[in-house]
């Protein structure tokens, strides 16, 4: 297996068009879900400084981050950092998750989304976001109502583009079709889960995005840190996504998704490939996501600035063809199921 070659000078982040729009974004995006819980405000500001200095000027947040009792705190932290820097950042956020106990405080209804966008703008300290995304599909609200509301948010100047997250391919196809039929703002992007241990979106969602010109901005490229190489199968994590630090419900979710013998067996083989290429498992894993031509930008999370060092290197890494084949062969089964199956 040949060694890796870089296509850009160190510290430079490649840019690309945001799907079929005229927007240009870095191929790496900073996720902010850790802000306010795993990373306090001081550390979060250091993380944003590190990212921006490296050219990662695309930030993604959500009104429910960091989830639990602290909903909204991540946006507040981002908003305070943004003061005086707003025009330097492509800013995305999401709505639809539960912001309170009432049923109308979540979902894709007109009431909730109009309330949610105003709340996000207030916390972020800005009068618009570049990309406003529906965080989750809401089967209880008519899709036309949700799409018309997102269109109204763009028309009001509160967002430049709209996107969705966590959508199944058939629902995404229907949503895209309805925006065309109703002459509404088109869906510019989709934010799915995607990594070497979860490849199911390759079967339907990625081809759909390619056909319709949607940008693809995957989250979880390191499988909640499992593909960072910092965990072993015998660990009992006391911090991070697999621990109670993030709340038991979230920890249970990530443990169910990834913490399995099969996943660690795969990681052992992935680590060998990374070593042969002279790179880290984390860099290899993100570079693999970015090597998919349908992927626009990969979302990176961090709970301290040092964690970005490895992951930022992925922007400069061109995987050789034989490495791509080896990685594809090794993880082929994850196109049909995840590590729990």
Where are these regions (language model features)?
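N-terminal binding-site loop/beta-alpha segment at the start of enzyme catalytic domains
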Residues: 1-89
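Active-site mouth loops of central-metabolism enzymes
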Residues: 32-42, 99-114, 137-141
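Short, acidic/polar
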Residues: 39-51, 108-124, 172-176
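Structural motif
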Residues: 50, 54, 123-124, 157, ...
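Short beta-strand segments at enzyme active-site cores
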Residues: 58-62, 91-93, 128-133, 163-164, ...
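Structural motif corresponding to the early beta-alpha repeats
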Residues: 65, 84-108
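Active-site groove signature of glycoside hydrolases
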Residues: 121-141
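Beta/alpha (TIM)-barrel catalytic core signal, keyed to glycine-rich beta->alpha loops juxtaposed to Asp/Glu
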Residues: 137, 141-330
């Amino acid at each position: 297996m040949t060694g890796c070659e870089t296509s850009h000078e160190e510290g430079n982040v490649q840019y690309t068009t945001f799907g079929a729009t005229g927007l240009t974004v870095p191929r790496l995006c900073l996720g902010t879900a850790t802000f306010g819980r795993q990373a306090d405000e001081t550390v979060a500001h250091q993380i944003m400084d590190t990212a921006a200095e490296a050219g990662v000027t695309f930030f993604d947040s959500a009104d429910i981050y960091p989830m639990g009792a602290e909903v909204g705190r991540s946006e507040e932290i981002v908003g305070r950092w943004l003061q005086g820097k707003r025009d330097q950042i492509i800013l995305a956020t999401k709505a639809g998750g539960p912001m309170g106990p009432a049923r109308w405080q979540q979902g894709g209804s007109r009431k909730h989304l109009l309330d949610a966008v105003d709340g996000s703008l207030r916390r972020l300290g800005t009068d618009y976001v570049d990309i406003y995304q529906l965080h989750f599909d809401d089967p209880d609200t008519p899709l036309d109502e949700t799409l018309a509301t997102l269109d109204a948010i763009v028309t009001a100047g509160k967002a430049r583009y709209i996107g969705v997250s966590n959508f199944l391919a058939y629902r995404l196809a229907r949503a895209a079709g309805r925006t065309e039929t109703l002459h509404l703002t088109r869906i510019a992007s989709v934010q799915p889960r995607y990594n070497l241990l979860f490849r199911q979106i390759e079967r339907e969602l990625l081809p759909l995005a390619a056909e319709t010109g949607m940008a693809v901005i995957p989250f979880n490229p390191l499988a909640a840190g499992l593909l960072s190489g910092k965990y072993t199968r015998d660990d009992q994590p006391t911090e991070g996504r697999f621990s109670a630090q993030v709340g038991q419900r979230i920890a249970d979710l990530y443990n169910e998704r990834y913490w399995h013998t099969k996943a660690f067996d795969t990681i052992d083989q992935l680590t060998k490939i990374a070593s042969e290429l002279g790179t880290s498992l984390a860099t290899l894993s993100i570079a693999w996501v970015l090597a998919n031509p349908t992927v626009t930008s990969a979302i990176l999370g961090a709970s301290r600035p040092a964690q970005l060092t490895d992951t930022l290197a992925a922007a400069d890494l061109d995987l050789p063809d034989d490495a791509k084949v080896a990685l594809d062969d090794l993880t082929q089964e994850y196109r049909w199921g995840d590590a729990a199956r």
